[in-house]
Amino acid sequence: MRSLVLFGEYMVWNGVHFNLNTIIPWYVILIWSVLYFALLAWAWRPKEGRPFGNFKTIDFVYIALIAALLIVYNFFISPLIPKVGTVTTYFYYPIIGETFLVMLAAALVGKPGSAGLTVFIYTLLSDIIHYGFGGEPFWFIYEVTSYAAIIDLWLIYRGKYYMLPFRGVFKGVASSKEPSGESVASEELEEELKSAKALFIVDALLGGITISMAYPFWWRGFWGPFVLGISFTPSLWAITSIASIGAGAVLGLVVAPFIYYIKRVLT
Amino acid sequence: MYLLAGIYRPSNGSIQIFNHDSTKLSGKDRVKLIGYVFQDPDQMLFSSTVRGELEFTLKLASVHGREAEDRIRRIVNYLGISDLLSQSPHKLSVGQRRLVSVAAILVAEPRILILDEPTRGLDNEMSTALMDLILTIKEEKGMTLIMVTHNMRQVGEYSDKAFVMYDGTVAFSGIPEEVFEESHKHPEWGISPPQVFEVTRSIGRPTASIRRVRVNAA
Amino acid sequence: MLLSQILYNPAINWVITLVILFYGPVLVVYLIFKLIGFQGYMSLFRFIEGKSIIYRMDPRTKILLSIIVTTVAAITIWWISAIMFVAVMALYALLSNIKEKLRVALPLILASFIGTAWTESIFAPYSYLQVIFHHVTFLYVFPQSLAVLGITQGSGTFYVPYLGYVSNPVGLTWEGIIYGLQITFRAVAAIASGLLLIFSTPPSDILRSLEKSGLPIELGFTLLLAVSSVPKVLENSMVVLNSLRARGVEFRPRSRNPIRLIAESLFIIRVIVMALVSIVILTLRDARQIAIAADIRAFRAYRRRTYYRDIRLGRIDYIAIALLIVLLIAGIYISGLPGMGAVPYNP
């Protein structure tokens, strides 16, 4: 796997063309990826020698089950229906399912890095059972940085309230009188629920737009040309990216009530 | 079971239910004949409120207006879940969800009710209460009740006729006592008679009734 | 002359177009539901003990097999993938209960062929075809308005048989069919080798070998739970759909009256959305139980854990790994030869 092969005028390695003649300049992608991986390194930092220190067992279970739902949706159900409307996101149902399930995982786990982990597990699984590892590891970087990054960033602020029309307000430190003081610290802070409908709408819009823009903006703008060596016109890139913002907003708002209902039922 | 409920079609032959060919029935007519309560209530709850769940069944059975209102009120009073009407069925406890799933089927007033392991996941007291309730409804409405169960005590207590399904065919049929008598076949079928039956047999009255004795205080 | 008038008569053109659009997917649905059924789908993921070489191999060797086959398939021309696919299918002979497995795996692979080749033959982006083949031939042209569906549209003037020169035609291309077959061969080689691993290895052994290869146990656990939950999700989907059918839902609108027909169709869409939410709830409801079960068995309690049954590389494994490395090197060499590289993948 680790060898370079000269192919035409490009260097091709594991199916990657390393074409840097892209619409989004490579350094933007580099900075964005480095920033996001730093966030993941922080979110998945070990605690007491265990990686993913913040995550509880049930978080992994939620992520695994949602990855299984994604696999079933994308590889067993989607192929049964003709893919109509690939140009815009509005009627492209594979993306609708992905939006719903990735946002659901982020909502149920509610920790930064949860969207990234879901997308990572899903990509790994789909490589194993369907696509093959050609073009890796760049597809991993593409999927993680474009589908999950903004949701994970937003989760730093929203945390467990993501996709709930509430926000937590610290009432101040609940007196930690116990002299032993073993498990005090931040969990002992009393939080009060404040209604925040506007934040709920921002949650929905942000999630929908992030996932809707992944393909037209990030893939057409950089990863597709970079890995496959093909090219797109800047006008197509710009028009589909802008169109996908609208589609993403609509999709986010449509799936939001369902995610809210499921989160309420399960927690 | 699925064949009977019209979910699958038989590969050949046909099924006659009250002189209707089940394969030719439309969905609307089928719900009025047969109700099927699934093992896990989560498998059959779809709406965001209990009322919506009952209305969903009635809509499919083409019952509208006052009639629908009346039926909903009757069934929830009957099952004692009238205070749950505006709640989400998914948020209820296991026992309550079970009652809602039974209500969602009974509201269409089917003539045959199929129950797939109706007391799975319920404690002893709860399952006795539920079975008594279902039996009362059965007697009052004159329904036929078909129940799938591994619980031999329930077979002994509640059924008029028992069928032993083994290896895809009906291995034996008869009244429950006759099934329990066939003791040499039990290891093969994987069943063991309830203790009540063993006791009555050991005191020398093998076919003594083991039916649940119900006292009507009225 | 006559043929062109028949083929491109507006009404006939629309009929042929719609048949081409829907024939492939309908055939796929038929294959999956009539020949396999959901039950068969689920048996794909059930492990049955066996005694042949393939069961005695180290799981890591089989994981490596899957990775190397998919990698080589991804970087080389389609007929190399086809050869590897045949070779992997030959290994299926070593599985126990082979008939049952082929009864499920073959229609699945066939469905994958028809589905992908059919879709790509009309939906492959023109820019891809131009890059790969440098020349695109349109076999049949659809009404121009269908370009909005994302059907292949050429830019420029093309000669179309029986019609003459057309500018910016929309339709079925010969290169699209070839392209579809190429990426299908790649996909089926990957699917077949992945299924071989799942068929011949108990899930706990896969987890152990992932952990031994240095993957954090959290990732291995999540990955394996996801794989083993796939049949559960399929089963849940089937049961939920059946319970809707038992309550009298007809998934095909029946009415002849157009207004009623639309109302019925909207109702069906609403029911399907309700069913999807139910499937998600039914699946995720188990999460707490699974988490408790994992915690009780001391998941994540110790960094290094030992196992009662250790897995070790044997002689067969070393031979197999040597062969796989030869395959990989050969694959990389071949992919560099002119005209032997792979075509890009269109998701």
PLM feature segments, named:
Chain C
Residues 91-99, 200-201:
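Structural signal for the C-terminal ends of transmembrane alpha-helices
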Residues 77-85, 101-106:
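Short, aromatic-rich membrane-interface segments at the entry and exit
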Residues 1-57, 61, 65-78, 86-90, ...:
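Transmembrane alpha-helix interface motif
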Residues 105-262:
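Juxtamembrane/interface alpha-helical elements of multi-pass membrane proteins
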Residues 75-76, 94-95, 122-126, 337:
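Helix-loop junctions at the membrane-solvent interface of multi-pass transporters
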Residues 11, 15, 56-60, 98-105, ...:
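Hydrophobic, aromatic-rich alpha-helical transmembrane segments
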Residues 85-93, 109-110:
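Hydrophobic transmembrane alpha-helices of multi-pass, membrane-embedded glycosylation machinery
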